[in-house]
Swiss-Prot record:
GO cellular component term, pick one: apoplast
Tissue: Slightly expressed in roots.
Protein name: Peroxidase 71
Cofactor annotation: heme b; Ca(2+)
Localization, UniProt: Secreted
Phylogenetic placement of the source organism: Eukaryota, Viridiplantae, Streptophyta, Embryophyta, Tracheophyta
Keywords of the record: Biological rhythms, Calcium, Disulfide bond, Glycoprotein, Heme, Hydrogen peroxide, Iron, Metal-binding, Oxidoreductase, Peroxidase, Secreted, Signal
Entry annotation: catalytic residues: H75
Highest taxon in the source lineage: Eukaryota
The protein's role, per its UniProt record: Removal of H(2)O(2), oxidation of toxic reductants, biosynthesis and degradation of lignin, suberization, auxin catabolism, response to environmental stresses such as wounding, pathogen attack and oxidative stress. These functions might be dependent on each isozyme/isoform in each plant tissue.
């Protein structure tokens, strides 16, 4: 009987493991007081469904909101923590800072908030809506979902000057490492999270310096010659700097690992991306993430949970905004 019972327990464990593997990535939240999986289970049980439906509707109208919301969450967390301060509008707020001027998807977050206030007034924070929406955009672009710890409250301060430390398109690996490390993220988190560039675009004005004038040369020598000619056609030297180019050439709207493969071929659009391949500190990680049995999806989920717990406001601090674009 003991043997039979042990076998039954083993089978039960394996069944649970299979469900976990084929469902969503099992990323667990870090030790942050106040955030947990299912925070709104009793106070607003349909919270995640309402957010998901709002994101689905926004994506159906304009698929560009997927990389926009993902980037918005990243920028929110990197400036005084994941407190929804990126969502506040007005003069000299984070939204007006240079790196944030082209962010898309604010209307999706506002729509979700309106519906949540109707269903559960004063319960769900804008910071949590943004964290949940970022996860949902990955799913919509054929990525793998994960469990998002919730329970954040909203910050009351949003200053454009605080956005100066956001990672930039010309940053070296060393500079990127410094910026990530300052927030408790390591080099692997850096390479994994930047893999979010598998969806989205960049304006020609952001990287055109690589195409025509880099350190006295005609172009950045790390760019594949064929790709260089392609980029120069898309982004002429005196052309419109607002023209958008896929960050993951050939697969710019699908969540996959081709972004890393492009780096290995000298086809990274941003300088800060391409150096992940040329720098020996990060190249081995890129090689692992582009491998046939890549763990990118699982690792991205884990790093997103780590990032989403940066500097969160919980407990009696902060507030639950009535509208995401303004403090109460």
């Amino acid at each position: 009987m003991g043997l039979v019972r042990s076998l039954c327990l083993l089978i039960t464990f394996l069944n649970c493991l299979i469900i976990s593997v084929h469902g969503q990535a099992t990323a667990r939240p870090g030790p942050v007081s106040g955030t947990r999986i299912g925070f709104y289970l009793t106070t607003c049980p349909r919270a995640e469904t309402i957010v998901r439906n709002a994101v689905n509707a926004g994506f159906s109208s304009d698929p560009r909101i997927a990389p926009g919301i993902l980037r918005m969450h990243f920028h929110d967390c990197f400036v005084q923590g994941c407190d929804g301060s990126i969502l506040i509008s007005g003069a000299n707020t984070e939204r007006t800072a240079g790196p944030n001027l082209n962010l898309q998807g604010f209307e999706v977050i506002d729509n979700a908030k309106t519906q949540l206030e109707a269903a559960c007034p004063g319960v769900v924070s804008c910071a949590d809506i943004l964290a949940l929406a970022a996860r949902d955009t990955v799913i919509l672009t054929q990525g793998t979902g994960w469990q998002v710890p919730t329970g954040r409250r909203d910050g009351r301060v949003s200053l454009a000057s605080n956005a100066n430390n956001l990672p930039g398109p010309r940053d070296s690996v060393a500079v990127q490492q410094q910026k990530f490390s300052a927030l408790g993220l390591n080099t692997r988190d850096l390479v994994v999270l930047v893999g979010g560039h598998t969806i989205g675009t960049a304006g020609c004005g952001v990287f055109r310096n690589r195409l025509f004038n880099t350190t006295g040369q005609t172009a950045d020598p790390t760019i594949d010659p064929t790709f260089l000619a392609q980029l120069q056609t898309q982004c002429p030297q005196n052309g419109d700097g607002s023209v958008r180019v896929d960050l993951d050439t050939g697969s710019g709207s699908t969540w996959d690992t081709s972004y890393y493969n492009n780096l290995s071929r000298g086809r990274g659009v941003l300088q800060s991306d391409q150096v992940l391949w040329t720098d020996p500190a990060t190249r081995p990680i890129v090689q692992q993430l582009m491998a046939p049995r890549s763990t990118f999806n699982v690792e991205f989920a884990r790093s997103m949970v780590r990032m989403s717990n940066i500097g969160v406001v919980t407990g009696a601090n902060g507030e639950i905004r009535r509208v995401c674009s303004a403090v109460n």
